[in-house]
Amino acid sequence: MFMSQFHATTIFAIRHQGKGAMAGDGQVTFGNAVVMKHTARKIRKLFHGNVLAGFAGAVADAFTLFEMFEGKLEEYNGNLQRAAVELAKEWRSDKVLRRLEAMLIVMDATHLLLISGTGEVIEPDDGILAIGSGGNYALAAGRALKAYAGEHLTAKQIAQAALKVASDICVYTNDCIIVEEL
């Protein structure tokens, strides 16, 4: 018997003018047909408020990864890059963890990283990342905003606007947007 999962979302993160911001929508979808929640929080502050982490994918899987990542942050005393690499190694090498269907974006005051279950830890050249069903729309909007209006907008404003664009296009992304800043 096939069991549907709770999933689909958009997470966008940007480093801009010395600040960091991460935005996520609030929609949780069950399977491909039913919106179960409109106001979910998919972004968390970790390690004494010094790290932001956002997830896209299956909710239960993402919570498992949040807990693991938080443990790695504690183990490596807040070293974001080391914690991310160690999580990715464990995620990829463990038979059970390898089946988790989620992705994470994590950031601190200096780094922005994508962590995937295939073992990738990627730091973007342009300081912008987006994941999830509306990720490509948010990424395009964020890049355009940073390139053409960046000197007039804050990181928080760009993150909010990029998610709004994604919510207008993607059926799995809503406009109940939560933005966190560092």
UniProtKB/Swiss-Prot annotation:
One of its GO terms (cellular component) is HslUV protease complex. Pfam families: Proteasome. Its EC number is 3.4.25.2. InterPro entries: ATP-dep_Prtase_HsIV_su (IPR022281), Ntn_hydrolases_N (IPR029055), Proteasome_sua/b (IPR001353), Proteasome_suB-type (IPR023333). One of its GO terms (biological process) is proteolysis involved in protein catabolic process. Belongs to the peptidase T1B family. HslV subfamily. Protease subunit of a proteasome-like degradation complex believed to be a general protein degrading machinery. A double ring-shaped homohexamer of HslV is capped on each side by a ring-shaped HslU homohexamer. The assembly of the HslU/HslV complex is dependent on binding of ATP. This is ATP-dependent protease subunit HslV. The gene is hslV.
